[in-house]
Amino acid sequence: AVLAQAMKAAGARGAKLLVLHTAAARVGAMDVGAVTEGGLAAAIEGAEVIYNLGADEVDIAAGPLVIYQGSHGDRGAHRADIILPAAAWTEENGLFVNTEGRPQLALRAGFAPGEAKENWAILRALSAELGATLPWDTLAGLRKAIVTAHPHLGRIDAVAENVWQPLEVRAPAKADFIRAVRDFYLTNPIARASQVMAELSAMAASRAAKPLAAE
């Protein structure tokens, strides 16, 4: 209901509406169809084996076998039965899509430590071991396949115009708004592994807890 009201207001003023998502890469995932109706909970419900691609903000109950592919020893790694160490996003080249749908080219800032591999290389090697070899064996080949399937991802720094699909306007429910993000400093495994971010989080919590005295 709130989104429908916002879309109605934007349309009446000839403005554009930008949705700020709460998870990195969500827009890119929607672009390539890597989404599940009902979210993560629905995706893993009843699963016997879960291949976790660095999803550390989801609770996985006991039962299924969990294979974790990620860069940091965060929540997902602690729940995993098998861990495949991968490069962090700063340690590999890639395409990113920002919240407005703009494809961006990213170059790695450094190499992954130890035996960690680039994410695409892990998936390609695993596909060969499973007898379902993916039809590319280089990053360039993968990128070509992505752009062939989704041409707009090849238009770097360009925003595709989407067809406006207004929602049915309903009266919002009588409920309080809640904060989607509780701690902006610790929203992902890389941030949670950072001493600097931990210090900033503690400082923010301290400021919020202290009452302000009138001058």
Predicted regions and their residues:
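Long, low-complexity segments enriched in small/aliphatic residues
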Residues: 143-215
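Non-catalytic alpha/beta scaffold blocks inside enzyme catalytic domains
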Residues: 1-156, 210-215
